[in-house]
Curated annotation (Swiss-Prot):
GO biological process per UniProt: lipid A biosynthetic process
Any one cellular-component term (Gene Ontology): cytosol
Lineage top rank: taxon: Bacteria
Entry-annotated residues carrying O-(pantetheine 4'-phosphoryl)serine: S36
Domain annotation Carrier: ranges: 1-76
PTM info: 4'-phosphopantetheine is transferred from CoA to a specific serine of apo-ACP by AcpS. This modification is essential for activity because fatty acids are bound in thioester linkage to the sulfhydryl of the prosthetic group.
Pathway info: Lipid metabolism; fatty acid biosynthesis
Protein name: Acyl carrier protein
Species this chain originates from: Deinococcus geothermalis (strain DSM 11300 / CIP 105573 / AG-3a)
Similarity comment: Belongs to the acyl carrier protein (ACP) family.
PROSITE patterns for the chain: CARRIER, PHOSPHOPANTETHEINE
InterPro entries, A to Z: ACP (IPR003231), ACP-like_sf (IPR036736), PP-bd_ACP (IPR009081), Ppantetheine_attach_site (IPR006162)
SUPFAM superfamilies per the UniProt record, alphabetical: ACP-like
Function field: Carrier of the growing fatty acid chain in fatty acid biosynthesis.
Amino acid sequence: MATFDEVKEVIVDKLGVDADKVTPEARFVEDLGADSLETVELIMGLEDKFGISISDEDAEKIRTVQAAVDYIGSKQ
């Protein structure tokens, strides 16, 4: 099952943000400053780390750190 810390690790790596800014309620674009390319790279990083495939439709719904954790948990 995806843990917050595992997802956080990918976010810090892909977005280059400070780990302390990555909270469950943090929004990728508004709070963490991700642009569209970084968002795609983040989704790909999560797919690689957790061995899942995230459809474009689902990716558009994943806007917060907690949403990513919940989505990954539902796919494992």
